[in-house]
Amino acid sequence: MANWRFTIAYDGTAYAGWQIQPDNQTVQGCLHDCLSRLFQAEMTVGGCSRTDSGVHALCQVATFHPPPESPIPATDAHRALRQMLPPDIRLLATEIMPDGFHARHDAVGKCYTYVLHRGELQSPFIPRYCWILPDAFNIHAMCAAAKQLVGRYDFTTFSATSNVPGLKPVKTLTRLDIREHGRFLLVTVGGDSFLYKMVRRLVGFLVAVGRERLDAGHTARIRDARERNAGFDTAPPQGLFLEQVFYDEAELQAFTPGDLPFLQLMGEGSAQK
């Protein structure tokens, strides 16, 4: 059976997340409809990450099995799908993979970046892709808290789901970086896998520390308490980007995140080291 790997980027603003839902527009649903029209049969496509409503992706990876009798080669299907998909979903690459490849099961890790904006807005486009916050932030405290979250821990405190059969709350964070880019703060989170809304909960916690509503010195205690009502908010979805998916452990460990390309278009200042 042929096995194709799609690499997809999308603006999640208009979508109720990745996963197909009966009464809502989703990214997976849009791909399903386009593939079914192209191959004139009911098709399925499986993604590596079930991004939530309003969350964006720079590198979503999906697995697709074309019909065995189909005469359409991958290169032609790629061109056709790029024309069929809406402008806010872009098919970046189509690759032929070994039969056993699975976009979700074979992934060894993912990297997300969350965009925060501090202070007065200079561009009307920013709220679509950022969490807008006041100017005053204690970056040093945020970085101190972030260091205490890197490693292998039970992240129940940072999950929005409880009492799920088979839930494995112990995860490994390989990185939790905070970078300044003018008025923007970029929070990059890398790990082997994540609990439901875990990245947004981590960002919400760091924001509470940065605004000095929580003490960075209490990070380990809050982490290990495994209590979801820990005095911080879940960050809103629009600032979150799935930045990279990894299928090689060495690439996960060596990955260096870059500045999200659209930041330069928003006129909010140059990068700060």
Label the model's feature ranges.
Residues 1-273:
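Structured-RNA-binding interfaces characteristic of tRNA pseudouridine synthases
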